[in-house]
Amino acid sequence: MDISIIGSGYVGLVTGACFADVGHHVICVDNDADKIKQLKAGEIPIYEPGLEEIIHRNVSSRRLRFTGNIEEAVESSQIIFIAVPTPPLPDGDVDLSFVEKVAREIAGVLSDYRVIVDKSTVPVKTGEKVAESIKRYNRHGAEFDVVSNPEFLREGCAVTDLMHPDRIVIGAQSEHAIDLMKKVYEPFMAPILVTDISSAELIKHCANSFLALKISYINAVSAICEASGADVERVADGIGMDHRIGRDFLNAGIGYGGSCFPKDIAAFIAISDQLGVPFHLLREVQRINEEQKTRFLKTIRETLWVLREKRIAVWGLTFKPDTDDVRSSVAIEVVEQLLREGAHVVAYDPKGMHKARAIKAIADAEFASTAIEAISDAEALVIATDWNEFANIDLAVLREKMRTPIVFDGRNLLNPETMRQFGFHYYSIGRASVRPQ
């Protein structure tokens, strides 16, 4: 099928590349001329495992191309996906101006029937607004259908998630649009759930909020474990073995971040408030998430006493491993607070350095080129992102290079007993701290 994706960020680029890889002909559109120039030159502006290879393969086979021209995309495609940003507003709502702008641009060039698909994460009832905008600004009286098709991609696993989805959600009113969407997803051989548009829009917010709830739940439990001497990892294993609960997203740490969870939860709270049904549970999820960062920083403060002029290494800047995305990263927040208190921060991340350097709030940090360089002569190490590279570090080298062997593990990446044996003072989340033998 002929498909266009308007918006070539994380969601749009991965979606377009994977659609092309299963045989569709795809045009990815973006209004960022530099990004389109990069993509045409074979340079991939984001890091996502497996994505670069897929893009190069499908550009070579002429199933995937890039343009800044929406008119070209609309005229060439049966189905048009909207995958533009929906950034958060100060009140927790989301800015839908990019979605509205694209809807108007589509309307301006739409002359024949097309299916317009909301792929961006949007508040319930957005599909109705998109349809109204296209109808209002289309001068040709062209027929069209609007569909909600939320994405469930995890950065770092996005290619796998798209190629092997748990489910496909299609929210639509038209049987013709549903049939076309089923053809798009036929190669993926995944269960398809067909709903009304509002339900599809709500499913995305409900899913992300529930996952964030699991994270905040285990983080709240971690505080109880620290107070009682229990081990949060064993507690999580015990409850996660129940198939009704599952072990995923029960990893205690310094809280969730990224471009989705914080924004989507705030948006869901705003949506529920606007509907007159306040979602108090989600406010508590937010509170626990903030409290977890505060507790972690308090441990650092109480252990090191005065942070001013202390050399502190920070491993990890991205909001999670296997991505270069530093948006709303808890790791960045930790670095920012350490700098604010006068620490000399030396930071390292396997993939996020370029984007982290551009963040003004942490401009005073020193950026190392390797993990070992970061910890050389450090008075403490903070692990803020759970990259495999950090889990597999040579602890003897780590101990030798550090000035004082103090580690604050915000992701429970290392084994407490092993850290004790190697002579570290080790502090993690929801587990007893250890001291050298």
Task: Pin down the residues of each PLM region.
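Structural/interface elements that position substrates and couple domains in central-metabolism enzymes
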Residues: 1-437
